Amino acid sequence: IVSNYTGEEMDNFASVLENYGVKTVNGIILEADTNHYISQNPSYLLPNIESNDITSNLSSQSRYILMPLAQGIETTDNYRDTLTIQNILTTSDSSYSKVNVENMQTMEKESGDIDGPFHVGVAISEDLEDDKQTQIVYYSSETLFNDNMNTMVSGANFELISASVNWMCSNEDGSTISISSKSLDTSTLTIPAADASFWSIFVMAVVPAFLVILGGGIWMKRRKQ
């Protein structure tokens, strides 16, 4: 299941989610932690990748998932005990949900905005009779399927989608459905906003200052000779 933010009420969709123990948080998530967003845009989330069967390869390789314009996902208060809900992607403790999206004047946290952290991807399973099982994966932003977003994280978004499908389609013998793909696109290096700021300052200020000092030292040495 994939959803996208809308200002309209979606009662039927909400009832389906709540039947499986989850619901969406009002608004769009913004990050205050510069290690969890890119492009100087707090809505371009780099969520934490939680460790589970779906994310094992991605988390072990310290990959990034990029999810712009995501809504928060939270569990309902009294979901039935036959449901198992695992977190796939979560935001940082500094994240918050901007409630008044249509009239948003600032990206700063305001009164009425909802404190994080939030889930932005969950895996839900439920054991049924006759050894059958319901399996659902839910992500709260359709941008996960966007080619440009996928390229910005070197294909990690599509790998997550493939792993999610594999988890839901796995057979009793443990085999999975897998379609490998090769891309001719140039890989993109994804750097969190905090790291980007550091390297910008380093390249634009520290390196030139070092070269000036080094050049001055060489000039003084030659002058004395």
Which stretches of residues belong to each language-model region?
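Short, aromatic-rich amphipathic segments at membrane interfaces
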Residues: 144, 151, 178-203
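Juxtamembrane interface at the cytosolic side of transmembrane helices
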Residues: 212-225
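Long, positively charged, glycine-interspersed low-complexity recognition regions
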Residues: 12, 205-206, 216
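Noncatalytic linker/hinge segments flanking ATPase motor cores
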Residues: 40-47, 177-188, 219-222
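Acidic, S/T/G-rich, low-cysteine, solvent-exposed domains in lumenal/extracellular/periplasmic regions
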Residues: 1-175
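Hydrophobic alpha-helical transmembrane segments of integral membrane proteins
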Residues: 204-205, 211
